[in-house]
Amino acid sequence: MKLVVGLGNPGPEYAATRHNIGFLVAQKFAQQMGVSLKRQAYQGIVGTGRADGQETMVLLPQTYMNRSGVSVVSACKSKGIAVEDVVVIHDEIDLPFGSIRIKVGGGHGGHNGLRSIVDLLGCRDFLRVRMGVGRPQGQVDVAKYVLGQFSSTEKSQLDNVLENSVKALEVLLQKGAQQAMNEFNNRVFLI
């Protein structure tokens, strides 16, 4: 079984923020798989379906970003999911908005959701889909920026970015990390 985790914060006040782009991609992926994300389990919202013939669980942790690892570890232990079968989708300020970067393993890079997952899994070897949200301009606080709404320009591009992110996720699950990196890394998906 594969576990696809979209990182974000629960609640309507966070729904359309940059920090919740992981939720948005995971929700779009589940929708395209025909999976309903309504069941509460593992301190998150989950749905299970088949992606390219393999059972795949989509998880949206409801623990708030800084405790995402609690939800991920709970699902992994309950379902016997190996670390290499975990894919985490998250916002990345070090990439421009519209870019996607597939990565195998690595540190948390200051991202508290990743920090929680790495700390509680005791391992950093899971797959990541890093979603570029860009850096704040001027003296804007990073936390305020990622917890802020997308700009009107970003909103106009968001559907295209999400569609390409789902394509990247599908290639990652079907053909592996190297193929997904070759096809999607170092590209910006803006119209």
Swiss-Prot record:
Reaction catalysed?
Answer: an N-acyl-L-alpha-aminoacyl-tRNA + H2O = an N-acyl-L-amino acid + a tRNA + H(+)
Cytoplasm as a keyword?
A: yes
Q: What is its EC number?
A: 3.1.1.29
Positions binding tRNA in this chain are 14, 64, 66, 112
Task: Give a Gene Ontology cellular component term annotated to this protein.
Answer: cytoplasm
Coarse class of the protein's main subcellular location: cytoplasm
The role this protein plays is: Hydrolyzes ribosome-free peptidyl-tRNAs (with 1 or more amino acids incorporated), which drop off the ribosome during protein synthesis, or as a result of ribosome stalling.
Q: What is this protein called?
A: Peptidyl-tRNA hydrolase
Species assigned in the record: Syntrophotalea carbinolica (strain DSM 2380 / NBRC 103641 / GraBd1) (Pelobacter carbinolicus)
